């Protein structure tokens, strides 16, 4: 809800700001080129500065301080989205005016741009959700979107009346080469450090046992530093938030979640465990001799696959 709110605020602000552009003598194509470049470069810059843009992970369900919760969500969403959405809000009216060519055709121009925008929003959501994110991951998907903005900037420049036609062609080729080289030289792990942290701060990468960027979340498992008292302690971190753990305290209640209900049933043959987590509840249910089948459901396939790291604590639940 907050991200949608910030998105709409950005679009609205951009629509107000573009009025000043219309009242000036600025070249609309030039302004649109700059806006497309700004969107692309901001997205690329955010990949390098995600830890600075977003606050450290925290408990977002603290309802005792609703104003603080609201302001923190708003600040994070604004840092990530506000400037690009302002640029998008300015681009839409500029495109309408460029396509219309005059007040007498404003209806046609608005319909064409609005139709293309709606179609693009639907197609973009489908392609991103079902193709880009599963196949490319978050970083490469964002980089691809930023590249599309930069390519649109190139197209607008190439089809404009800047300089001579030959010079425009040469500059377009150079820009395309620069974009290609930059894309090829991008590190593939820019967002890894962002997800390798929780509310206690940055985690030690030397203690990383498992890492996977999945469709719905990014999962990391770290070895906890509890010393000789608990040498096998581990922590499950999803999207930068510590969600579960294997240690003396956590393991006791997680296994009790299975043992107590099963002991209260006369003939417990089938068990359903909602949320897999570290798999300790699922594994504990499976050790009961009367239980014939245990089903565990979880929204995250990455969390389930990480369960192998906890096999010594969850009774090897995934291979039982």
Regions from the language model: what does each represent?
Residues 1-320:
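Alpha-helical transmembrane segments of multi-pass membrane proteins
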